[in-house]
A protein has these predicted regions:
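Residues lining hydrophobic/aromatic ligand-binding pockets adjacent to catalytic sites
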Residues: 1-183
Length: 183
């Protein structure tokens, strides 16, 4: 009945200013062995454990070099499992844009012909009091997350766990938690 952090070790020595797409996973020890043990300990009695751990272990065995690539693959595989189809993933590193912070977000939205940029609530500090979306046709919306409740193994519901928690507990039924969701 407690939450825990799952972390993946990365190579960081002398790499303080690296871009997110340059962060390498540290394979000097098996970075996923501990994660799988923690997941087994905490979720093995969940109804959908076998199904979800199989997806995760398949991904972990791929020896993906960069953390961003691992994140992308995890998102894609979760979308596939939940039958969320027709979504295109575009890496900002492939767009040849050199601006920074809030301006970068605006430039990406504009380059992709977006008319709305959805930002996490509380991320206004990222714009440093200079809102590049102001006085443009692109609308900046702040996403205020209202956490859905679902059946968990614990007696008391623990909010703000990752989608992995939801998947272990609800499996494909997790789709219902997103069906009527609006921003």
């Amino acid at each position: 009945e407690q939450y825990f952090w799952l972390t993946i070790p990365v190579k960081s020595k002398g790499k303080y200013n690296q871009l997110i797409n340059q962060v390498e996973i540290d394979y000097s020890k098996d970075p996923f062995e501990k994660i799988v043990k923690i997941l087994k300990h905490n979720y093995s009695r969940c109804k959908y454990y076998s199904e979800i751990i199989e997806i995760l272990e398949k991904i972990f065995k791929k020896k993906i070099l960069y953390l961003s690539e691992l994140n992308i693959l995890l998102i894609q595989e979760i979308c596939k499992f939940l039958k969320i189809e027709g979504k295109k993933f575009i890496k900002s590193s492939n767009l040849n844009i050199s601006s920074k912070k809030g301006q970068l977000l605006f430039d990406i939205t504009q380059m992709l012909n977006g008319n709305i940029y959805i930002s996490a609530d509380g991320s206004g500090i990222f714009f440093n009091n200079q809102n590049p979306f102001k006085d443009t046709s692109i609308v900046l919306k702040y996403h205020n997350y209202d956490h859905p409740k679902y059946k968990q193994k614990s007696k008391k519901f623990i909010e703000y766990c990752s989608i992995v928690d939801l998947l272990f507990n609800e499996g494909i039924k997790s789709r219902k938690k997103f069906k009527n969701y609006e921003i």
